[in-house]
Amino acid sequence: MRRSSDPSANKKKWTKASNWRPRMVRWQRQLARVNALESTLQAEDDQTIRKRSLALRYRAMAGEKLSELLPEAYALCREAGRRSLSMRHYDVQILGGIALFEGHITEMQTGEGKTLTATLPLYLHSLVGKGAHLATVNDYLAKRDAEWMMPLFEMLGVSVGIIQTEDDQGGRRKSYGAAITYGTAKEFGFDFLRDRLLLRAQNRMQTEMLGSGDGGFSNSGDQVVMRGMHFCLVDEADSILIDEARTPLIIGSIEDTVRDQIIETYKWAAENAPLFELDEHFEIDDETKRYELTARGRSKVRALPKSDLVRTMGLVDMYEYIERSIKTHREFLLDRQYVIRPSEKDPNVDEIVIVDEFTGRLAEGRKWRDGIHQSIEAKEGVEISVPTGQAARITVQDLFLRYPHLAGMTGTAATSAGELRKIYRTPVVRVPTNRPPQRIQLPSRVFGTLTSKFEAIAKEVEEIHATGRPVLVGTRSIDKSVLLSKLLDDLGIEHEVLNANNVEREAEIVAEAGGRGKVTVATNMAGRGTDIKLSNDVEQIGGMHVICTELHDAARIDRQLIGRCGRQGDRGSYRQYLSLDDDILKGGYGAIKYEKLKKRGEATSGSVDRLAAMFHKAQRKVERRHFRDRMVLMHHEKERKKMQREIGQDPYLDTPD
């Protein structure tokens, strides 16, 4: 890891980025105190280092302020990293760690050591004995980072727990009992809800057993697993705190009364949805994206043949089932938004698994709400899961607002600084790179259709591949990664494909992606949590070349992919390819203008690069709409909780379906 250890070399860049000179002066003073301890600690043996760490814990638990313990704690953490991992925290990482301790979100570029930086505030907050959590986007990254940093923490006498989806209650309790716990936002949220449900059940039972002399739970396995929410460091903070903010985490309660009728109606709607035509039978609201049947559409529903079970369903409900099914047929596509695979519970039964657009990974255990998931199951002919009510619910946004101490790290937060500060009260600071970036942006290319765009991409891959430089091509969906892979096969270009269907090979593919002559086609899986290292001879011939095949709903996601090249000051280049049938145009300008652009594209031969600005304008429109949605969510959740508390309800358990 090549980093500068001279703080003065980075001071100007940092101060300019944050524009907070007084705060920066104070951080530099703390850095100087950390540096002053380095030679002393290097002269001490491992046992003395551990004793120092134990003494710090006693002082913290006795009430001494963590800000006063910070210099020694960070110096100890740096020395433990040097000895156990051969990785020394450089000065900019120490500064980043100070910012994290003070509740900031730090923007650190790929390869600049976010995982190592995270150990600093995690260790410091763990000293008070209330637990420190690190939340990341998936189980793989949680396990990888925890195991990677574990020798450092063990040298300091600090225990580490890892939460994985398959863990049982006992395993989770043990992991939360550790000083530091790595896991995902989803698992932290579900454990919070399960504990809350359990506490309610215990309170009711204890009330019923009052006077019996038997506590009822002391020897039971039914015990809460979390021990509170003190500090959370959010990795990939923009993805979790912004992109996933509206995602509700729901524990369902099974309804048996009308199961057969509901399942039969889903099948009936899926069978008949393709018969309905846009404008004639249904309309789509450009703002809300809501599907609504026209008078002719409702008339068609009434005329459709129905089984006895479906016939007993209310007419308004039938309309909603058809509208929902039309939406899933048009907008939810196999190998884009979801995949079909054998169920983990029963390999003989297929199931629908969501593909997370922001990470490109399978969203294990997550289901779409409002009947969308069941409608897709009916469309694909797989077993329809039992519709559920809500036993408990919390949004990702609300989950992290419960932590009294919150901080985050990401490679792309500056563009969302205002939103993060407004919702989470977490200012954003940009940590400077240790070497000047050498990433080159090549002019964007615009084509009429997806086909002509992909043919041009394949040609560019062929040209770059001939030079020996590694190439990474990012796609928005699984089906497009497969399509591009076929084009490369036709050209005889050996390559790897990384998407949610072969996640088990992720580590192997990523490890080789920076090698000479390597070509990798990947979904967003390659955009977050991956650090593609170049082989020794690649830097001399220009480094990695990244191709973005279309714009995402947020510019931050595009920047994540671009950040795979030019890591740690290495050379690299990237280019964006766009076409007039890209989804971002539909999201930004609406269905009517999108169809006009699409027809224009079909009549266009060659490239129309002058239209590139139109795509970025559409992206900004989508970003603004999503921002408004998140603001509305925050206000709605705040008002709902306030009202429920006023009438004596639990805002997380007494939730409307």
Curated annotation (Swiss-Prot):
The keyword Magnesium does not apply. The gene is secA2. It catalyses: ATP + H2O + cellular proteinSide 1 = ADP + phosphate + cellular proteinSide 2. This is Protein translocase subunit SecA 2. Its EC number is 7.4.2.8. It comes from Rhodopirellula baltica (strain DSM 10527 / NCIMB 13988 / SH1). Pfam families: P-loop_SecA, SecA_DEAD, SecA_PP_bind. Part of the Sec protein translocase complex. Interacts with the SecYEG preprotein conducting channel. Has a central role in coupling the hydrolysis of ATP to the transfer of proteins into and across the cell membrane, serving as an ATP-driven molecular motor driving the stepwise translocation of polypeptide chains across the membrane. Belongs to the SecA family. It is a peripheral membrane protein.
